[in-house]
Swiss-Prot record:
HAMAP family: Fe_S_insert_ErpA (MF_01380). Required for insertion of 4Fe-4S clusters. Iron-sulfur cluster binds at C51, C115, C117. This is Putative iron-sulfur cluster insertion protein ErpA.
């Protein structure tokens, strides 16, 4: 397990591989509180599919797998498995609530093309 803690008071030897925004962490915390299960963590993953070849997925998980990278932010944990890690390194995971609706958004510098749906990409 790889652990990354994002906080102003902690200095890490390497830069965080992802940006997990305050808005995303706060929304995850709200959803976990609504579920009433403090052991839940947000798992972000990449799988084959979508109109551009790959698509993002989000789910709650209680378990941390051996190959997971764990990021702690504002009292919640973000999990990314080793296969997805290579496609998400450098990405920003955010939460937006605007005229287009409310959703988690990934800004991925590794994506060479994206689909209009916003959840499909290619590298």
């Amino acid at each position: 397990m790889n652990a990354v803690t994002e906080s102003a008071a902690t200095t890490t030897e390497m830069p965080a591989p992802f940006v997990f925004t305050d808005a995303a962490a706060d929304k995850v915390k709200q959803l976990i509180d609504e579920e009433g299960n403090p052991d839940l963590k947000l798992r972000v993953f990449v799988q084959g599919g979508g109109c551009s070849g790959f698509q993002y997925g989000f789910t709650f998980d209680e378990e941390v797998n051996e190959d997971d990278t764990v990021m702690n932010k504002n009292g919640v944990q973000l999990l990314i498995d080793s296969m997805s890690y290579q496609y998400l390194v450098g990405a920003e995971i955010d939460y937006k609530d605007d005229l287009n609706g409310a959703q988690f958004v990934i800004k991925n510098p590794n994506a060479t093309t994206t689909c209009g749906c916003g959840s499909s990409f290619s590298v």
